[in-house]
Amino acid sequence: MARTGENIYKRKDGRWEARYISSYNADGKAKYKYLYARTYAEVKTKLIRVQNSVETKVEAEKIRDREKYEFWLFEWLRSKRIGIKDSTYIRYRNVIENHINPDLGKYPINKISTPLMERFVSNKLNNGRLDGNGGLSPKTMSDMLTIIKESFKYAQTAGADTICRFDGISLKRNSQEMRVLSVFEQQQLISVLFEDFDRYKLGVFICLYTGIRIGELCALQWKNISFSEKAIVIEHTMQRLQNDDPNAIYKTRIIITEPKSKASLRTIPLPDFVVKAIKPFVSSPNAYILSGECKSIVEPRTMQNRFKGYLEEGHIGDANFHSLRHTFATRCIEAGFDVKTLSEILGHSSVKITLDRYVHSSMELKRSNMEKLTPILV
């Protein structure tokens, strides 16, 4: 005989049995324990006493969880889910799961001090890459700190106490020079490209002489090129993201969206020699430039692999696809472009980014300028 709703039963041996939830596993499934007594009243008294104790314990665990930074980190992430792009949300989640939570999540939020945060930042700058090959860039670390700061603000608004102050935390590390192809390497690459010139090589050529990003290249359609205006219009970017759907066949998916900043929406004038190289490949307006088809795409990873192959073919030192953008910008500075114009062509959100990143003299430019001193000194 069972007492409805009480989880109390009379056993065949005459004793009374009570069942109660003792805890929950990681999937949220209840774990049960059992109590026994000779009478219903006795087992019910035991059950009430244990349930009160369990409820107190569960409540205490909830309080402890709320004290941990991990709780506030994921609460902040949930609060951001609506109103941001999928790509932004996935980037936030990956940074939290791969970097922030493993190192800081276990600490009570009111125990995360400025010195602890400084050690965290220093470690990430020097040894933070997931593949073990060195540290994260200051830009990546700056983005990570933004997430941390925002989650702290969220926790403070909800009443959590914090002691960490972010002012003065240094993001400097031993600087690594950008990989820029030398003039000779650029000539070698061009020789490789014009041998059996195809759509993939055209893509590399376009990036080398416009500085567009790999995602922007892959999203380009023929309607984005105006031959009458001799210009290329950048209005989309392509990227591969993790698939949030647990039932999806594939773990990742390709998306094409607008660039993340308004400055990236831009029109770039094309030199005549670039227009001439592009024209033989023209297809229908909605076809993608790299595939020549409307329903077929070439994704960034494919272009990265193709580019690596061209470097090997030309006996050129290792570089990633983004080096084409650095090379374009560097050649423009060497040719005397004004920084404002270059900044707009590159799609930078501010001229300062262009100045900090590209306005530095090459050895050739230094030598050329030093030669100008000769008539003055002799």
What is the predicted function of each stretch?
Residues 5, 99, 107-115, 119, ...:
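N-terminal DNA-binding recognition helix of tyrosine site-specific recombinases/integrases
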Residues 220-280:
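Conserved tyrosine-mediated DNA breakage-rejoining catalytic core shared by Y-recombinases
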Residues 134-138, 142-144, 157, 161-163, ...:
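Basic, Lys/Arg- and aromatic-enriched nucleic-acid-binding interface segment
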Residues 120, 189-192, 244-249, 335, ...:
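DNA/chromatin major-groove-contacting recognition/catalytic segments
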Residues 11-16, 22-118, 283:
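N-terminal DNA-binding module of tyrosine recombinases/phage integrases
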Residues 134, 191-200, 210, 268, ...:
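Short, basic (Lys/Arg/His-rich) helix/loop patches that form interaction surfaces
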Residues 173, 180, 238, 275, ...:
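Catalytic-site neighborhood detector that most strongly recognizes the C-terminal catalytic loop/helix
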Residues 61, 65-71, 110, 163, ...:
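Major-groove DNA-contacting interfaces characterized by cationic-aromatic clusters
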